[in-house]
């Protein structure tokens, strides 16, 4: 399909900046706009453009978004606009789901165990409650646990070094000690949390070029929706 026909059929009402984002062919493209301005609509159009105008194999496209619900909604919207066949061929995934694919590939192909299983939410709360009581000699309130989990997520997502953690002021007393004990408890139980999935996958990609090359060959185009919600 030529570009003019594609724009007529699928990009009606798009402004020049939106069209430029859809048509971009080389390098990285970042689309910044206020909520509700149509970023996801533009992303869906770009996916269609890559397939219909550029001849990209949909199996070579990875689209990531923030929640499981959002992946289902994007697949539905793309399928309604461009056909379910293309939508089924594409990988539309959360970041955590992609991380588990990377971890699984590493485990299967490098003779490693798949490391850890996912810690349940209630289990994580229980572990943190026990550690909090041990360190503070007091019972943790719901607010204290919530603040702890927020701080731990920040530390893991930002991949802070022990030195950076010591210097960080995240509003939680004894955070370095609690953080260390929490991770020790998870390892002893063979568990990891959602944030561990991403940092573990990142470490694998950095340390094992063969794994990185595999996913680079598998996906020639990567699109990220709601990228403002991702960490570094």
Regions found by a protein language model. Give the residues of each.
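Short, contiguous pre-domain boundary segments
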Residues: 1-4, 161
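Conserved helicase NTPase motor core
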Residues: 3, 11-23, 27-35, 62, ...
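Phosphate-binding Walker
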Residues: 38-45, 68, 73
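Walker A/P-loop NTP-binding motif
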Residues: 41-57, 77
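Conserved catalytic network of the ASCE P-loop NTPase/AAA+ motor domain
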Residues: 53-57, 83-85, 215
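Conserved P-loop NTPase-based nucleic-acid remodeling module centered on helicase motor cores
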Residues: 60-150, 166
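Basic/charged alpha-beta structural segments of nucleotide/phosphate-handling enzymes
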Residues: 124-195, 209
């Amino acid at each position: 399909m030529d570009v003019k026909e594609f724009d007529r059929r699928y990009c009606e009402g798009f402004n020049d900046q939106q069209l430029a984002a859809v048509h971009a062919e080389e390098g990285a493209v970042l689309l910044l706009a206020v909520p509700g301005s149509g970023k996801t609509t533009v992303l869906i159009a770009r996916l269609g453009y890559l397939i219909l105008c550029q001849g990209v194999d949909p199996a070579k496209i990875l689209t990531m978004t923030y929640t499981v619900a959002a992946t289902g909604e994007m697949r539905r919207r793309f399928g309604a606009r461009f056909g379910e066949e293309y939508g089924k061929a594409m990988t539309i995934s959360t970041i955590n789901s992609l991380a588990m694919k990377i971890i699984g590939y590493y485990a299967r192909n490098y003779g490693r165990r798949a490391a850890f299983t996912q810690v349940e939410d209630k289990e994580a709360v229980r572990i943190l409650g026990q550690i909090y009581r041990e360190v503070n000699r007091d019972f943790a309130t719901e607010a204290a646990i919530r603040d702890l989990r927020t701080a731990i997520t920040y530390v893991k997502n930002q991949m802070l070094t022990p030195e950076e953690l010591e210097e960080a002021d995240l509003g939680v007393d004894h955070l370095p000690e609690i953080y260390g004990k929490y991770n020790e408890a998870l390892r002893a139980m063979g568990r990891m949390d959602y944030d561990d999935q991403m940092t573990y996958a990142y470490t694998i990609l950095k340390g094992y070029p063969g794994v990185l090359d595999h996913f680079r060959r598998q996906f020639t185009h990567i699109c990220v929706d709601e990228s403002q919600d991702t960490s570094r």
